[in-house]
């Protein structure tokens, strides 16, 4: 199945939360399973920072949730109709900094406006309206996708029955913002960045590659890296280069990332992570969270080095104090933050029960 596209906000522009407007927003999306006659089995999937609209492929390629989706699996395509779209600001089909600005005929680049999670959610809702879906059985997301799911429950509390938030907190921590700052600086200080207007020249590949290497360390655990590499060295490694195997692994991941992601999108989405505030547009966070009516599943991984257990505990407390019907689960995993993408045995029951409302 090839990704599908639709242009939204072509007659009325989207007003952004931090100011500015966007019109003629292309949205790349994909669907899986079959929408039943009652239209009560639809589930929205919200992807993480560098994800896209295709968590699953049926042609031998691996989607980012490939082993979780299919007939009888946690994301059961025999039972549910799944909708997944690339986020606003992304670079996998939905309008973002690398897209053509209809007013100039050139990529937006530095002219792309600042966006927040609330803007992303508005575009997702417009997509569902286009598809004729007025209610969802559930919304599920991990990491950055969990923030989107949380905001959905606040802004449109009657739109869904269940929320499944995996490895994501209500607020991003100071340490995590610090990691993102270093990653952004690696990109911004690349000589080829040119203020974000690099599309007619050489992209800031070195900076983006370095940023990705740092990001990968926050997604993994020390135990996982120790098991995989330890202090093993490369037979052909250079002293100041990839001398240790773990260094070679990170370099590979950094270079691989260049094949599929745009530096400006990375900057904008990292900042959207930092800026996420569920109370934006409301009196305070308690007022915002008190709007939630959905049954809410929140899953924490004790070895997560990005969204740490303390951050999830704080989120748990805020949600409970706001009267949310919260179901909280916590467990360890060698995979750390990325566990929600790969540790099927740990997540299968929580996802299955969360979607069904059990």
Curated annotation (Swiss-Prot):
Keywords: Acyltransferase, Amino-acid biosynthesis, Cytoplasm, Methionine biosynthesis, Transferase. Gene3D superfamilies: 1.10.1740.110, alpha/beta hydrolase. Substrate binds at residues 212, 338. Its EC number is 2.3.1.31. Residues 41-343 form the AB hydrolase-1 domain. Belongs to the AB hydrolase superfamily. MetX family. This is Homoserine O-acetyltransferase. It comes from Haemophilus influenzae (strain 86-028NP). The gene is metXA.
